[in-house]
Structure formats: structure tokens, C-alpha cells
Curated annotation (Swiss-Prot):
Record-stated family: Belongs to the ferrochelatase family.
Main location per the UniProt record: cytoplasm
Annotated residues for binding of Fe cation: 210, 291
Record GO biological process: heme biosynthetic process
Keyword annotations: Cytoplasm, Heme biosynthesis, Iron, Lyase, Metal-binding, Porphyrin biosynthesis
Protein name: Ferrochelatase
Pfam families (UniProt xref): Ferrochelatase
EC number: 4.98.1.1
Phylogenetic classification of the source organism: Bacteria, Pseudomonadati, Campylobacterota, Epsilonproteobacteria, Campylobacterales
Amino acid sequence: MNLAQENLNSPNNLGNNATKSPKETVILLNMGGPNSLYEVGVFLKNMFDDPFILTIKNNFMRKMVGKMIVNSRIEKSKKIYEKLGGKSPLTPITFALTERLNELDPSRFYTYAMRYTPPYASMVLQDLALKEVESLVFFSMYPQYSSTTTLSSFNDAFNALKSLETFRPKVRVIERFYASEKLNEIILNTILSTLNNHKSQDFVLIFSVHGLPKSIIDAGDTYQQECEHHVDLLKDLMRQKNIHFKQVLLSYQSKLGPMKWLEPSTEGLIEKHRKSNIIIYPLAFTIDNSETLYELEIQYRLMAARLAIKEYLVCPCLNDSIEFAKFIIELVKNLKDE
């Protein structure tokens, strides 16, 4: 399958810009996900060839190790995406979010670029270079900063922009936003909505985030610190609103390989609190993906059933909700020149 065919599988609203004349474009940056079962291999290959993910300095060794990881995971990953309808939900949900953003804020154009699957930043920026765009906002869709996510996406986007010699717009960035009280109110409302008529004090609330090898944190990545700070801010907000859970905990999911990863694991906390009702919020994601809809919603739900946990609830991500869209617009409007 060639690049043009790949692009057909990944919706993007760049064409809509032809009927608009905003001078600023906001590009939502995320990791991407397979838009078909064919793209599972593309997704894994690109991810494990990323030096921010697989931090092996020797390019040859990184590619060799990456190829081994891809070969060991591709069939398992395809089965996961088969259960999700043959593709990741991340791209279509992001497309829906940009459509909503363009409706709510016609003064700017909102689009998106993915790190490991189409539409890549290079493709999006090539298109924008043909239009009279004067300024860009690179918007990281990760609430907390990490070299493995935020920095990787920014590095990719800036390298793609640098390669376009005649396109030199002003560029501003939003690299983290977890400390926003407005965001945390939206998160808390999502948790309460998921609880429905259940009492919060009857539940252990687990904020599950994507795990990282401890070596990356030891090298100076601030991700763990920011996740812990984020949970503290949410605890403060819950106290202010007199909302109480049995416990509020932070955990790390999606461990890969034999190396030491951040702890406690989400699986470990579910087992530890098997005698309690559990509600999980995916704190490091803004758009649902395989780690939320498969790992949390399917895999760990089966685990909870085996452990005879009475109530196991999983909150959705913010996705294309109007509240999240308005929050993004507010962040962009308040962004100071750098």
C-alpha cells in the first residue's frame, strides 16, 4: 500500500481550509494509531524506531531491537485492534474533535498530525505551506510532559517544518496543561458522570497513566513528577467540592519487556483492592485508544470479573466533548507569544 492509499484511510480536514481564511492554524499532535489492520505494522515499526521511545543511541542497534519487538508483538496487536473494529479509535475521534473546534472557533483553523501513522506532521505541514498561514500552534494532546510523547511529537513537527525552506510561520507551542483547574473540573465531572448514581465513598479511584521504564525517569524525564502533581491537584479539587473516595491512587499501565518500569502497576492495584469497588480514570490520555478501550475496558474488566470485584467502572477520555473543545480554544486564546 502506498502513501496515498494510507492517507485515504486516515480522515483529515485539511481540505476544509480551502473555504476559510484564518491566518493561524492549530495542529493537535498525538501518537496516532492504526487506521486499518494493515497499518498495525506501520504503527509499531515507526514507534519502536523512535529514539525517544527506544533510547538506544546506536541507530543500527535500535533498528535491530525495534524490529525484534515489532515481530514479537504484531500478531498480538492485530488481535487487539480486531476487537476494536479493525482500527484505532484515536484518529476518527481526533478528526471529530477538530471538526467541533472549527465550528466553535472560526477565527482559526484546527487540524491534527500523528507521530506514528498518517496524517504525519510532514504531510500536514506540506499542505499548510501552500496556504496563506502566518502562524502555527503546536498543541500536544498529552496533559503531562514527557520526552517519549510531547518532545517526540514536537521534534518531529519542527523537523518537518524545517525541511520546508519557503514556509516560515510564527510557531507557538502548548506542551502541557494538566495544572489547569478548568481541565480538572472537566475530569472530575467525567468521573462523577461515570459513577452515575453510585456513591463515590464506596469506590477506590485509580488514576491510570501510561507507564515508562524507570531509566527514562532517572535520565531526567519529568513525567512521573507531573503525573503525581496532577493527582495532588485533583485531590485538592475534590476536597474543595467535598467529594470523597475510599482512596485515590495513581498507577502505571502497559508495561513492556523485562526492564524496571514505574510502579505501582494498574493490574497490581486492581488485585490489591479486589474487595472494593473500583473506578478508573485514564489520566494521561485525552483521546480514547487501545490502552483505554482494550486494556482498561476489556482486559482489566475481565480481570476484575475473575477477582469478583462487584463494581468496575472505566471513565471515557475527554475525546470530542464540547467541554474539552472549549477548553482547547481557551488555552489557545490565552497563549502568550514566546
